[in-house]
């Protein structure tokens, strides 16, 4: 009986972490024109609220601004899928750069992280594969 309970506990833990979140189910179009960032970030937020999971990118071109990672997230990019940095518009763009006391001594690209295509700070258990 103890072995059965232990097995079921392990199985439920594995199942919870193995959930797959298809970004198209959250509104991503993957047409190379539509900005898919909101859909991708919603999928990541949903997975994070459930303890983590796999964010699945089916084939297509995902035009994006800042994708915000969370702990225990696996980005799986299927063959034929691309995540492409989009050009900012007058009303949309990448996350604002965080304040940095050394800005006057370094160029912008080496001093800031939050305005990147894919970023996260203080996270653990992150993988990107495909």
What label would you give each PLM region?
Residues 1-20:
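Bacterial Sec-dependent N-terminal signal peptides
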Residues 17-130:
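Extracellular/periplasmic carbohydrate-active domains that bind, remodel
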């Amino acid at each position: 009986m103890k072995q059965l309970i232990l097995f079921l506990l392990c199985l439920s833990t594995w199942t919870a972490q193995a959930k797959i979140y298809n970004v198209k189910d959250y509104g991503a179009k993957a047409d190379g024109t539509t900005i898919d960032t909101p859909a991708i970030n919603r999928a990541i937020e949903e997975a994070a609220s459930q303890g983590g999971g796999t964010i699945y990118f089916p084939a297509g071109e995902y035009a994006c601004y800042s994708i915000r990672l969370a702990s225990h997230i696996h980005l799986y990019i299927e063959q034929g899928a691309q995540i492409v940095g989009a050009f900012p518009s007058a009303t949309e763009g990448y996350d604002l750069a965080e304040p940095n006391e050394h800005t006057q001594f370094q160029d912008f690209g080496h001093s800031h992280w939050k305005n990147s295509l894919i970023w996260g700070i203080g996270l653990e258990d992150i993988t990107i594969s495909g």
